[in-house]
Amino acid sequence: MAFSYGFFNAKNLDRVYTAEDFTSYLSSLICNGILDTYGDNFLVTASGNLSVVIGTGKAWIGGHYFINDMAYTLDLRQYVDESLSRYVTIGISCDVSDSVRACKLEVKSGTAATSPSVPAFENTDTKTYLTLASVRLNGGITSISQSNIKDYRSDEKKCGYVKCILGKCKVSEILAALDSYNKTVTELNNRVAEFQERLAEV
């Protein structure tokens, strides 16, 4: 399975989760965004034709998670106009309305024009978005290049990365800080041991 999500209230047992699902949930953090320590962080890349590839990743939206555990190819040929250009925006949505209760990948199409604008996802009381990227589809295009793709993952107003509980650093940053701290402690312990050896020789 490429995608999974959770957790939502069940109706007639239509939403069932395992212990593994729950532990995966607990291993994530609170702030909305992409977990920067999992997979490819949903990187959107050109595939050489009219498709793009969504890399593996894990997102956190309002206490719900969305996982892509294998590369996912998204065909955009239906959005190509013969003569005019348009943008499409790719994102992850979390819909908590009773009729949906799910997270999924979404594409929002802009209007074809001589000077097209980038369509934006709009959050509502029941639906929240993380915008991954926008893709410019020039009129009559036969393949998408990487230069046609704009990455929004680091834009905290549109997406952003999951941060630690204090909301001041990404997971990878706090892990790097801990690694640096451990190296410093090890170095200090070595110096203390060396000093004690010298004292013993006196």
Protein language model regions, located:
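N-terminal alpha-helical "arm" segments
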Residues: 1-42
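Compositionally biased, intrinsically disordered low-complexity segments
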Residues: 29, 33, 37-38, 47, ...
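Conserved P-loop NTPase/AAA+ ATPase motor core
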Residues: 43, 49-51
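Beta-strand-rich solenoidal segments
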Residues: 2-15, 51-199
